[in-house]
């Protein structure tokens, strides 16, 4: 057995590892600073300012969002994009990794880009991603293209972090402008007349490319139907090795839309004379996945690309972009970049420190109430009859118990802050279940494990356990991949019949790793 390593005598255990953190710029960029004389954004100035966590005047942010939206509004549902092009997957508010993406993929000034959606939510720099990408869209309207993801909607941004982020960093007006802009995003792209590019995937109601062109996209995505499927659907977990003959089955992971099968993809490709489908929507350990090849073309029938490295700071995954040029497909991977730290849910330091302060205050209150012994209380109450004296004693004891319970709550909050954050992240509302804190440390840990197991996540998880693998992180985060409950979630009778039929044939397969090839010709 090896001996434990001794502490490096040169490593200080009293000094801060990070001695100082630069304060974000207090100055907000004005329109004169952001836009040149021709009304085009100065993206280099914008990038430098946002990298320092700087902000813009609200009128400037609104101008970028609305001008970008007006360009998006003029584009078709299905874009036609020529090669060469660099295709990017989910970003999810990871602005500093987005900057790394442009280093790997090439400058937008001389590189054609196609983004497959999910620019916001989960990460804490979503508004920076929107402002920068929309500024690039204004500057390069014919070479930078943005598709809609399932998170570009009111329902998910209210449920997750984007709305709260907009209100903290700017205002609800900026959030509303973003929602209007998201309604303008195209739904799909036809790349080089060979590849259909979407965020999620296929729909049983979309058989031809014209079916996409006919959709009304200028609205909040519905809870079912072809527009929902384009944004939400996934390939079957055992894609290419299906145990079902159905082309589409109910998507039990998302709680909406469908899983589509290898035969469904091959039939769609053959019917529309296409080579492959490029999509995002699912985190990948390597940043990408290539699925089973088409028997007619020998090319992967489906490719998933994911461009948010170390997703949520826990997945430990690589990110990737796909460069297609001269009929050669090249995958470029990259790792995460350092980024400023935000407390969970944009919490401020005063809220964060409240448990520490509260614990000390309640300790003092308990000590004040306990200043008299039972004998002293009894001697002071000789003037009262027995019933009154007993009642007074019980009132005081109840006060002490109440303060003691409050002290235990603050103590649990202080000692188990990581467990509290874990449990908050695993509950759909982001709130702790009632009575968890007052039950003490054991109740908190039990509730955390129950919350995880309720969503079929990894069993035996402990809040103190450090997540070490991609699959473990993906399992724990599974609850957040579902569509949150909404009022219009009930489909029409016709759609209900098809869903019931799909449910009857549902399977639970085990995924196999796709090809790890980085070049395809």
From Swiss-Prot:
Q: Where is this motif: SAPNY motif?
A: 307-311
Could you identify this protein by its name? Protein phosphatase 3 catalytic subunit alpha
List keywords of the entry alphabetically. Acetylation, Calmodulin-binding, Cell membrane, Cell projection, Cytoplasm, Hydrolase, Iron, Membrane, Metal-binding, Nitration, Phosphoprotein, Protein phosphatase, Synapse, Zinc
Which residue positions does N-acetylserine occur at?
2
Q: What ranges does the record give for the region Autoinhibitory domain, renumbered to this chain?
A: 465-487
GO terms classed as biological process: calcineurin-mediated signaling; calcineurin-NFAT signaling cascade; calcium ion transport; calcium-mediated signaling; cardiac muscle hypertrophy in response to stress; cellular response to glucose stimulus; dendrite morphogenesis; epidermis development
Q: What lineage does UniProt assign to this protein's organism?
A: Eukaryota, Metazoa, Chordata, Craniata, Vertebrata
List-wise, which residues carry Phosphoserine?
469, 492
Residues reported to bind Fe cation: 90, 92, 118
Q: Which SUPFAM superfamilies match?
A: Metallo-dependent phosphatases
Q: Which residues bind Zn(2+)?
A: 118, 150, 199, 281
Q: Which gene encodes it?
A: Ppp3ca
User: Entry's InterPro entries?
Assistant: Calcineurin-like_PHP_ApaH, Metallo-depent_PP-like, MPP_PP2B, PP2B, Ser/Thr-sp_prot-phosphatase
């Amino acid at each position: 057995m090896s001996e434990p390593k001794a502490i490096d005598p040169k490593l200080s255990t009293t000094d801060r590892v990070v001695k100082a953190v630069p304060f974000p710029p207090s100055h907000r960029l004005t329109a004169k600073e952001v836009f040149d004389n021709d009304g085009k954004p100065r993206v280099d100035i914008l990038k430098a300012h946002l990298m320092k966590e700087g902000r813009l005047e609200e009128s400037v942010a609104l101008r970028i969002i609305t001008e970008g939206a007006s360009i998006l509004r003029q584009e078709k549902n299905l874009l036609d994009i020529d090669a060469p092009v660099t295709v990017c997957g989910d970003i999810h508010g990871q602005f500093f990794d987005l900057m790394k993406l442009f280093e790997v993929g090439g400058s937008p000034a001389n590189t054609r880009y196609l983004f497959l959606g999910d620019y916001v939510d989960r990460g804490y720099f979503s508004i920076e991603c929107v402002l920068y990408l929309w500024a690039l869209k204004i500057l390069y309207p014919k070479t930078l293209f943005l598709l809609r993801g399932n998170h570009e909607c009111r329902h998910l941004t209210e449920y997750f972090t984007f709305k709260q982020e907009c209100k903290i960093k700017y205002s609800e007006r900026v959030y509303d402008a973003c929602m209007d802009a998201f309604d303008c995003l195209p739904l799909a792209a036809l790349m080089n007349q060979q590849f259909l590019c979407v965020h999620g995937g296929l729909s049983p109601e979309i058989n031809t490319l014209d079916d996409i062109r006919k959709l009304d996209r200028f609205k909040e995505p519905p809870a079912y139907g072809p527009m929902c499927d384009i944004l939400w659907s996934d390939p079957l977990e055992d894609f290419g090795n299906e145990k079902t003959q159905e082309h589409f089955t109910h998507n039990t992971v998302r709680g909406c839309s469908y899983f589509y099968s290898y035969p469904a993809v091959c039939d769609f490709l053959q019917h529309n004379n296409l080579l492959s489908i490029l999509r995002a929507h699912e985190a990948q350990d390597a940043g990408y996945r290539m699925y089973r090849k088409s028997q007619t073309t020998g090319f992967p029938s489906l490719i998933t690309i994911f461009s948010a490295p170390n997703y949520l700071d826990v997945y430990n995954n690589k990110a990737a972009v796909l460069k297609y040029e001269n009929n050669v497909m090249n995958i470029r991977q990259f790792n995460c970049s350092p980024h400023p730290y935000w407390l969970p849910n944009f919490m401020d330091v005063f809220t964060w420190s409240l448990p520490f302060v509260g614990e000390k205050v309640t300790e003092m209150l308990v000590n004040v109430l306990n200043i008299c012994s039972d004998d002293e209380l009894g001697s002071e109450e000789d003037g009262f009859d027995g019933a009154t004296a007993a009642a007074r004693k019980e009132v005081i004891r109840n006060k002490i118990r109440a303060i003691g319970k409050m002290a235990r709550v603050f103590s649990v909050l202080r000692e188990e802050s990581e467990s509290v954050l874990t449990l908050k992240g695993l509950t759909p509302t982001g709130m702790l279940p009632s009575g968890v804190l007052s039950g003490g440390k054991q109740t908190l840990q039990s509730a955390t494990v129950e919350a995880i197991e309720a969503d079929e996540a990894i069993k035996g998880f402990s809040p103190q356990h450090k997540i070490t693998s991609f699959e473990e992180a993906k399992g724990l985060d599974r609850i957040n991949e579902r569509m949150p409950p909404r009022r219009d979630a009930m489909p029409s009778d016709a759609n209900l019949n098809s869903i019931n039929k799909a449910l009857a044939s549902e399977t639970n397969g085990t995924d196999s790793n796709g090809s790890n090839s980085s070049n395809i010709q």
